[in-house]
């Protein structure tokens, strides 16, 4: 059996597993958060950390929503309140007792665009991908349910 990604898209969730020899070698889940790597958006610098090239921006998302992200590699002349185009380079990370904000970098001249979907990210690598209907049981057959249980309990 050839190595490939199996992909499902459901309501509010995308998931993909990389299978080879009937076994899951890796898994990815996307929950549709717009603030993830690849997003290019307008933002306002709301705080600049003194003496550094870092700060905090508020990104303008669809339908008037706004979210904050850390920003690094700010130009020296960027002052609080300035509007700039940024590209998200790291998604938010939830750790026990701590929420790390997404990270962005200035992206002058880039076209505004949403972050790529999980499917688009995989397809961009050139990897073989087979999209499945959500009614298929291929994920379960390859051990998806056990993998999710291991991730939730921390027991392998």
Language-model region placement:
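Single-stranded RNA-binding surfaces
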Residues: 1-156
């Amino acid at each position: 059996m050839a190595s490939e990604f199996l992909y499902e898209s459901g309501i509010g969730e995308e998931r993909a597993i990389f299978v080879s020899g009937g076994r899951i070698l890796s898994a990815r889940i996307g929950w549709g958060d717009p603030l993830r790597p690849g997003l290019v958006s307008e933002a306002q610098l709301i705080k600049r950390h003194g003496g550094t090239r870092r700060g905090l921006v508020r990104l303008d998302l669809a339908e008037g929503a706004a979210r904050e992200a850390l920003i690094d590699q700010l130009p020296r002349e960027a002052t609080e309140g300035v509007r700039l185009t940024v590209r998200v380079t790291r998604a938010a990370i939830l750790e026990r007792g701590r929420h790390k904000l997404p990270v962005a970098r200035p992206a002058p001249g880039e076209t505004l665009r949403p972050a790529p979907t999980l499917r688009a990210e995989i397809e961009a690598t050139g990897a073989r991908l087979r999209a499945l209907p959500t009614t298929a049981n291929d994920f379960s057959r390859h051990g998806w349910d056990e993998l999710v249980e291991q991730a939730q309990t921390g027991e392998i």
